[in-house]
């Protein structure tokens, strides 16, 4: 939320996607231009679109389509993968079960996380131990989503390499103990038409104003429904209008801490005033689950020499949010 931006920048990241893992990439002018655009976007808006990302438009649409087909199933069928504390907070949640700042959100969703084996991370991860609950229908759901998530993990890693360079850090600064084993979250979200929600439950907000927890979010949204809004420094809400074939990206809380506030996450919300059901698939690229994220030295030096934020263990941050996010 660094400026009074009126629009969200669009960045063609194809030079970065193609060359960021090449040791000679520091001399590539096209790649360095993308890095500069990432820096500008992270400072000014905290949001940006990416094209040239290498994920097929047909795959992005297929993921949205199977998500919509699942939400069209009878309620009893959807409840077969119902989210519970026993499921590690993975699975289906009905409209109004997710809460933002005390108010129910008018969406339904499937929540997926990096699978966690019992005992991994000790007590830190105990509430989230488990594997993802994939629906039986549509029949290709699990294979499709697992492939999609794998591709987005790698794309996110490449974008974070560009963001590392934008901050003046080594290209692999977000690897190793920070995000060498990145945790991920994927939320498949459906926003019903408001008139389809019982009046006693209805609010005007599909998802209340919030910032994201981790490093980077990539949103695959319907091509033709405006609903995602981003707040600029003056408090105006700016539409993140759909641009077919792009991801809407935004930075999160962990990047704010790591950069000592050089990059700030931006408040955003979803208001679905469309007469049609809306689908959005959000992929969250996080630090290592057990990473202790704190302002790094060279970012402190660039911001007055003092850490503006205390150390945060990402897994503690996530578990605290998850345990207070739902009414079941």
UniProtKB/Swiss-Prot annotation:
Give the protein's biological function.
2-oxoglutarate-dependent dioxygenase catalyzing homoarginine 6-hydroxylation thus producing 6-hydroxy-L-homoarginine. Guanidine (Gd) is in turn synthesized by the spontaneous conversion of 6-hydroxy-L-homoarginine to (S)-2-amino-6-oxohexanoate (RHEA:79843); guanidine is a nitrogen-rich compound that can serve as a defense or signaling substance. Involved in melatonin degradation. Catalyzes the hydroxylation of melatonin to produce 2-hydroxymelatonin.
State the species of origin: Oryza sativa subsp. japonica
Q: Give a Gene Ontology cellular component term annotated to this protein.
A: cytoplasm
Q: Which Gene3D superfamilies match?
A: B-lactam Antibiotic, Isopenicillin N Synthase, Chain
Protein name in the entry: Homoarginine-6-hydroxylase 2-ODD-233
**Activity's thermal dependence:** Optimum temperature is 30 degrees Celsius.
What subcellular compartments does it reside in?
Answer: Cytoplasm
Q: How is the cofactor bound?
A: Binds 1 Fe(2+) ion per subunit.
Q: Which residues bind 2-oxoglutarate?
A: 278
* pH dependence text: Optimum pH is 8.0.
Per the record, the similarity remark reads: Belongs to the iron/ascorbate-dependent oxidoreductase family.
> What does it catalyze?
L-homoarginine + 2-oxoglutarate + O2 = 6-hydroxy-L-homoarginine + succinate + CO2; melatonin + 2-oxoglutarate + O2 = 2-hydroxymelatonin + succinate + CO2
Q: Which cofactor does it need?
A: Fe(2+); L-ascorbate
Q: Which InterPro entries match?
A: DIOX_N, IPNS-like_FE2OG_OXY, IPNS-like_sf, Iron_ascorbate_oxido_reductase, Oxoglu/Fe-dep_dioxygenase_dom
Q: Outline the inducing conditions.
A: Induced by cadmium.
Listed GO MF terms: 2-oxoglutarate-dependent dioxygenase activity; L-ascorbic acid binding; metal ion binding
Q: Which UniProt keywords apply?
A: Cytoplasm, Dioxygenase, Iron, Metal-binding, Oxidoreductase, Vitamin C
Binding positions for Fe cation? 210, 212, 268
């Amino acid at each position: 939320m660094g400026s009074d931006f009126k629009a969200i920048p669009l960045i063609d990241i194809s030079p970065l996607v193609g060359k960021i893992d090449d040791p000679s990439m520091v001399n590539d002018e096209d790649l360095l231009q993308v890095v500069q655009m990432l820096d500008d976007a992270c400072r000014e808006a905290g949001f940006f679109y990416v094209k040239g990302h290498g994920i097929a438009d047909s795959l992005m649409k297929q993921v949205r389509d199977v998500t919509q087909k699942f939400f069209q199933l009878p309620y009893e069928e959807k409840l077969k993968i119902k989210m519970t504390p026993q499921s590690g907070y993975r699975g289906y949640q009905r409209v109004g079960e997710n809460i933002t700042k005390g108010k129910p959100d008018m969406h339904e969703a499937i929540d997926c996380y990096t699978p966690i084996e019992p005992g991994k991370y000790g007590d830190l991860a105990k509430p989230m131990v488990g594997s993802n609950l994939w629906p039986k229908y549509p029949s290709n759901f699990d294979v499709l989503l697992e492939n999609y998530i794998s591709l987005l993990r790698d794309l996110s890693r490449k974008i974070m390499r560009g963001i590392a360079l934008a901050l003046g850090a080594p290209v692999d600064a977000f690897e190793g103990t920070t995000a060498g084993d990145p945790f991920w979250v994927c939320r498949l979200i459906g926003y019903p038409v408001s008139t389809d929600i019982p009046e006693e439950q209805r609010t005007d907000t599909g998802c209340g104003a919030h910032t994201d927890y981790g490093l980077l979010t990539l949103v695959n949204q319907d091509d033709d429904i405006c609903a995602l809004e981003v707040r600029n420094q003056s408090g105006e809400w700016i539409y993140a209008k759909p641009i077919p074939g792009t991801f809407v990206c935004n930075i999160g809380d962990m990047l704010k801490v790591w950069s000592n506030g050089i990059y700030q996450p931006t408040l955003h919300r979803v208001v679905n005033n469309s007469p049609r059901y809306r689908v959005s698939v959000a992929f969250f690229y996080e630090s290592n689950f057990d990473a202790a994220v704190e302002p790094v030295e060279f970012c402190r030096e660039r911001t007055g020499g003092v850490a503006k934020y205390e150390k945060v263990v990402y897994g503690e941050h996530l578990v605290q949010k998850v345990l207070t996010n739902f009414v079941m």
